[in-house]
Amino acid sequence: MSFSRRPKVTKSDIVDQISLNIKNNNLKLEKKYIRLVIDAFFEELKSNLCSNNVIEFRSFGTFEVRKRKGRLNARNPQTGEYVKVLDHHVAYFRPGKDLKERVWGIKG
């Protein structure tokens, strides 16, 4: 797997792929409903992360919020000025075993 010039996949691409997958299984669901489900899914992810909940999808991975320590020697890349960064929270994703194996090319 090469990481130079990787193609970007958009939400519309994902909607198209899911729609095709559904059609291949002899089901019918309009793309606008697929988009609604995807939007609702991400809203729930954001809402749960903002509530400091851990979201686990077995074999795929875990989403959580972690606290990142501040530091004194951060540098603004535009001005070169040194600034103080306070402690803050960041969204974090920890991949699950199956995802790691697929990305690394390991047969499971």
Curated annotation (Swiss-Prot):
Q: One Pfam family, please name it.
A: Bac_DNA_binding
Output the Gene Ontology cellular-component terms: cytosol
Task: List, alphabetically, the InterPro entries matched.
Answer: Hist_DNA-bd (IPR000119), Histone-like_DNA-bd_CS (IPR020816), IHF-like_DNA-bd_dom_sf (IPR010992)
Changing residue 4 to P does what?
In strain: UK and VS116
Q: Which UniProt keywords apply?
A: DNA condensation, DNA-binding
Cystine bridges: none
What mutagenesis or variant effect is reported for residue 69 to R?
A: In strain: DN127
Q: What is the effect of changing residue 33 to C?
A: In strain: CA55, CA128 and DN127
A single Gene Ontology biological process assigned to it is:
chromosome condensation
Molecular-function GO terms, alphabetical: DNA binding; structural constituent of chromatin
Give the record's family classification. Answer: Belongs to the bacterial histone-like protein family.
Function statement: Histone-like DNA-binding protein which is capable of wrapping DNA to stabilize it, and thus to prevent its denaturation under extreme environmental conditions.
Q: What's the protein name? A: DNA-binding protein HU
Question: What's the name of its gene?
Answer: hup
